[in-house]
């Protein structure tokens, strides 16, 4: 059973709410390269994200000196660059402004053809129209939504 779990975890990763707990290197550049098989396409996508989000000039800065929102952006850029079957995201947009949130929603949409996402959120509107299923806990009942239909 343990062997099956280890095998499963090789195909997925988790983004925790507190991005600080996930960083393993000092600089933003090192963090984005850590454990990655960097293709030209991944590098291009990371560069695009860094430029769009205003982080490109901070590549040599310590990730621990960034604001909480910037740390969350670095965490998402790093994890969305991975080629895994499944990403588990816990409050991925916490601390992000609307512009950054929309950027990552679009990136998730692009990647959803190749990857599965399990996303835990309190604010549902950013992912409206993105997910195939939505499970809500409402008044101690689970409500499952599937592409516009509801079943309890």
Language-model regions, residue ranges each:
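Conserved ABC ATPase signature
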Residues: 62-66, 70
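Q-loop/switch helix immediately C-terminal to the Walker
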Residues: 18, 24-40, 45
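A short, proline-enriched helix->beta-strand linker immediately N-terminal to the Walker B motif
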Residues: 81-85
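Conserved H-loop
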Residues: 114-121, 123-129
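H-loop (His-switch) and adjacent beta-strand-loop-beta switch element
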Residues: 130-148
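Conserved ABC ATPase "signature" region
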Residues: 41-58, 77-80
